[in-house]
């Protein structure tokens, strides 16, 4: 017998404007810090999900690493994660196509 899923967190529990939920998944506002000593999820910084990326912001390397890191954090394949805005800046919008309740539970662990 499977254990029941925890209740879906309210998207309003996260920083304002950081998480947008719809039927297909979530869109996450991300603040990326390239050329860090290692790639890692930091958590919430102001109104964004902060990640540190070891890759330099050259030829899309940091963007590719950002997508891979977020896919690994949420436990979804990379093909379900896409960069929808911010290809050339630190502020990004990342779309994750997966059941929103599971994604929000993962995000709640950072709060």
From Swiss-Prot:
Superkingdom field: Bacteria
InterPro entries: DUF167 (IPR003746), YggU-like_sf (IPR036591)
Gene Ontology terms: cellular component: cytoplasm
Name of a matching Pfam family: DUF167
Assigned protein family: Belongs to the UPF0235 family.
PANTHER family assigned: UPF0235 PROTEIN C15ORF40
Name of the protein this chain belongs to: UPF0235 protein glr3835
């Amino acid at each position: 017998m499977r254990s029941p899923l925890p209740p879906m967190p309210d998207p309003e529990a996260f920083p304002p404007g950081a998480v947008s939920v719809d039927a297909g998944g979530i869109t996450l506002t991300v603040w990326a810090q390239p050329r860090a000593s290692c790639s890692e999820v930091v958590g919430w910084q102001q109104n964004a999900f902060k990640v540190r990326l070891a890759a330099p912001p050259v030829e899309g390397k940091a963007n590719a690493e950002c997508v891979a890191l977020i896919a690994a954090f949420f436990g979804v394949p990379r093909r379900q994660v896409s960069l929808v805005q911010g290809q050339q800046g630190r502020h990004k919008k990342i779309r994750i196509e997966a059941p929103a309740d599971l994604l929000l539970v993962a995000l709640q662990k950072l709060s």
